[in-house]
Amino acid sequence: MFDYQALKDTALKTAPYDYLVLEKFVEPSFFENVASDFPEISGAGSFPPSQLKIQGAFKQLMEALDGPTFREIISEKFNLNLDKYPTMYTVRGRCAPHNGQIHCDSASKIVTVLLYLNDAAWGEDGGRLRVLNSPDSLEDYAEEINPNWGTLLVFRCTKDSWHGHKSFDGVRRVVQMNWVISDDVVKKEQRRHGISAKLKKITSIFKSG
């Protein structure tokens, strides 16, 4: 399912912070099955697995992403022992115009993994995540990542790991997985995302009505 050799061969970039980007990390032959089993998400925002139907090829993908082979490669790349840290993940199916504002991930996160699962060619100007040199402007960036099918972005979470993207409104499928400092963080974040997801569903029902 994953091209582990390509990941091993991908160099870690160290400016403006530690990160790596790899296109086609998910092998193209899995596109149809994973796309078919991608959970149904009607609104924008991050949804924890407890609020979604995780099944089939998508479930297999998540099990591999949280598996020992991927963890070992990322541990070596970032010179970390990730075996002692728990993971958590959320799924996004849509992007709202206000999403993508410049930010760093929280201090409770050690490494962030973003795996994009959109069509092979992203034709939009918005929604392309930028690795930023500073928090001052989206135009001050080191690299722009197209959220094409199977594109992987992994970065070390620091006080300077600024990122964001231009506004986009529409379908934008991405999985975010994090290694975090403790199980308490997992419980807190999953609970927070769960409450947020329920509120989004209620809001969506009222809007459709």
Where do the protein language model's features map onto the residues?
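Fe(II)/2-oxoglutarate oxygenase catalytic core
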Residues: 1-154, 158-209
